Amino acid sequence: MCGIFGIVAHHARVPAEVLERATRSLAHRGPDDSGTVILRDSAREADEIGLGNRRLAILDLSPQGHQPMNDPATGNWVVYNGEVYNFREVRTKLEQSGLYFRSNSDTEVILKAYGHWGERCLHEFRGMFAFALWDAQRHRVFVARDPMGIKPMYFYQSDRYFMFSSEVRTLLGTGLVPRVIDCSGLLNYLTFGSLYDPNTLVEGVSALRPGCYLIWEEGQVKQEQYWDLVGPILGEDCDPACAGAEKRGELETQVAEMLDESVRRQLVSDVPVGVFLSGGIDSSSLVDILSRNGTRPSTFSIVFREADYSEGEYSRAVAQHFRTDHHEIMVAQSDFFAAIHPAIHAMDLPTIDGINTYFVSEQTRAAGVKVVLSGLGGDEMFAGYSSFRTVPRMERFARAWDCMPKAVRSPLASMFRTLAPANDQNRKLIALSRNGGGIVHPYFLSRMLFTLEQQNQLLPAMETNSAAFLRAQKPLTESLSRALGLDPVNRVSYLEARCYMLNTLLRDSDFMSMAHGLEVRVPLIDHRLARRILALPGSWKLDSGTPKPLLVGALDGRLPEQIVHRRKRGFTLPFEHWLRDALRPMVEDNLRKIGDGVLRTLISERVVRSVWQDFLEGRTSWSRPWSLYVLQCWCQRHLSN
């Protein structure tokens, strides 16, 4: 796991001090080693390429794993962040083709694989990765991101420079990117409480989307998609595991085998591996698989004094059942208050989530662990959210509503707006009644933070009409178009994976864990496993009596009953309580300043005060004022001149 940066100077020279400063800014992602190199394009001597890397040593701890890494046979160079779990298998294939290796690292496998297969090397890799490679023979930069989007990659292009990095903050820190807020990104953030790829909050900076690669050549950037959850892309062969096994029992066995394989693959490491344990089905399944494979893992859990939020009872039960080396991390209001500013500083992009991961990552790394497994993705793949039931109902409502004559719809909608209590759920129902099957799909409405109407009030100076809203949500409509052919449950699964999981959970997990030099691995979303699960009938993933029946069936009764049938709580902090108590003065003071900074010409101070008052009086969720607090903090730190 690492942090990477690169800069291509087109008809110019790479500023060496910019390369060094940008690489240093990623030190938290890679505290073990650092390296930079400046290359001259042999064919176009007017162009230079600078590559930088900060390394967290997990595989091949020797100096042979140093980056940037060069392949003398081709002249290619690579910087790489992540892990290719099947690198030994890929290496064997390459050795059989006559290639020679100097190290035991997966970095060199990527370098040689690209030299041998070109961009088709991406279909050989199973893992989480973002890498950039200077192709010396074709005089181009090749940048790629893993199929599920576990590892981040951002890029920026001007007339003179093309830059890429693991973090947006690093690009801003070069001084070559204007500190201008991106209005589509702002709308996107206010809609969902995080930025949805390829949007960022910085004008001109974009995220490379999952399962995509990018080629920079002669000053031009071209992007291609090589993989997606819903089917083969660019000639990739279907996974043979997706054929046959039509009976449910056989499929549960197959899912169990693929889960087991994914967990075992992700244990590849030259340092100890721990587990984030919440006491839910997903993380407990990882502990079960590790135990059956003869491993006694170290497990780490957050517990709170507020019993309504704490999962300590369940995580302790799992730890005792499987006899793990268990560590509990007690988080009190005072701890949160002390850590709030460092945690927000760790945010590469603003988000309403992720601070829980900051706490557990800090303590896990302090215990001497460099790598952990997480159950992230289990809810998306195995239908663990309430959205798997509510969104199909909302879809049916939208279709029925659209079939009604307008003369009937209008008075009904007006009556509901007049009589319904003013709360978040009713605001979404009102938006759905106005929208029907129109610009906002019910899934996106279910995840929505501020509706279009609320954004109009919050951003009076901006063009927040339907057209602007659609432009900001364009990536989501593309995801929806891919999901429309799936059954209702699998459609929600695809959208949760490509929207909420990708842009909130995975991104937050990455920058909050890497703030402490900790690598988080996610076996439940191995890309082949995820595609296999998405291909199964949605009806098999919902059951009136058993949560996540497909996953529970695959585990064959090995989890404690109290874990299987417990009420779902989620890995969350007691924000509702804390914002009304210890955090209230700090948040109120910050929200009062929202008119003094970079947001002063965009956001209505009056509406911000109204949002805060609605929260205090119980008319809206904590997430709305908290999102504005985080936005103000982030913009003040990164976009203020």
Placement of each model-derived feature along the sequence:
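Conserved S/T- and glycine-rich ATP-binding loop of Class I adenylate-forming
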Residues: 277, 375, 501
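Adenosyl-5′-phosphate
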Residues: 1-7, 46, 173, 182, ...
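A structural signal for short hydrophobic/aromatic patches embedded in well-ordered alpha helices
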Residues: 22, 189, 412, 530-533, ...
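A structural signal for short, well-ordered beta-strand segments and their strand-loop junctions
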Residues: 133, 143, 163, 372-374, ...
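Short low-complexity, flexible loop/linker segments enriched in glycine and/or proline
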Residues: 341-345, 387-390, 578-580
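Active-site adenylate/phosphate-handling loop in enzymes that bind or generate adenylated species
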Residues: 147, 359-420, 505-529
